[in-house]
A protein has these predicted regions:
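N-terminal glycine-rich phosphate/adenylate-binding segment common to multiple enzyme folds
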Residues: 1-3
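Conserved phosphate/ATP/ADP-binding segment of small-molecule kinases
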Residues: 7-91
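Glycine-rich beta-alpha junction loops
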Residues: 36, 72-76, 98-101, 133-136
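Short, small-residue alpha-helix embedded
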Residues: 39, 102-125
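Phosphate-handling active-site elements
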Residues: 91-93, 118-132
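Short pre-catalytic strand/loop immediately N-terminal to key active-site residues, enriched for Gly-Thr
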Residues: 92-105
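Charged C-terminal helix
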Residues: 126-179
Length: 179
């Protein structure tokens, strides 16, 4: 689910309506941040508490999407964030990670790409979600700020080598990442 905060309201609404009617019926797993999905799928929500991942999954299922991965839910503490794969019947996977400082750009895209790749390889949905979330957590942990702006996930964190004291590795460049 792309962020549309920079769009004017009317074109954004037209886009969201088209997305709802044309794309959701063709979607197996909808991936999105809790507040974005809430505003889009449940704009008239009147509950005393924010909608749960299951509430959002019900709304997505009404449009033809059987699974919804909701990210950015309040975790068990202020320092944690919860991510849940839900259906209208219940929560299939719930993974909690430590919350990172900073504002990230590309986290949702990184998660969606990782999940898509794992599913394309034939990984079971619940396993793919857990692995994709673990990959995202590491990409964010190794994230970098290329300038004065937001932090980008380091999607190639796994390919970086750490410099050790071994003589054979003294010529390798050191890697440095900032959060």
């Amino acid at each position: 689910m792309p962020g549309l905060s920079w769009w004017d309201e009317e074109p954004a609404e037209d886009y969201l309506d088209a997305f709802r009617s044309l794309v959701l019926p063709q979607t197996t797993v909808l991936v999105g941040e809790h507040h974005q999905l809430w505003r889009w799928l449940l704009p008239e929500w009147s509950g005393n508490k924010p909608p749960t991942a299951r509430d959002i999954a019900r709304a997505a299922a009404d449009a033809g999407t059987p699974y919804t991965l909701v990210t950015g839910l309040a975790g068990p503490s202020e320092q944690h964030v919860e991510n849940q794969l839900a259906t209208p019947q219940g929560i299939l996977v719930s993974v909690s990670f430590e919350r990172f400082e900073g504002v990230f750009v590309g986290a949702g895209e990184t998660l969606s790409a990782a999940l898509t790749g794992l599913l394309a390889l034939g990984t079971e949905l619940e396993t793919a979600v857990s692995e994709a979330l673990g990959y995202l957590d590491q990409a964010l942990a190794h994230g970098f700020r290329p300038g004065m702006g937001h932090v980008l996930p380091d999607r190639l964190f796994w390919a970086q080598t750490d410099v050790t004291e071994d003589d054979d590795e003294q010529d390798l460049p050191a890697t440095s990442n900032t959060r």
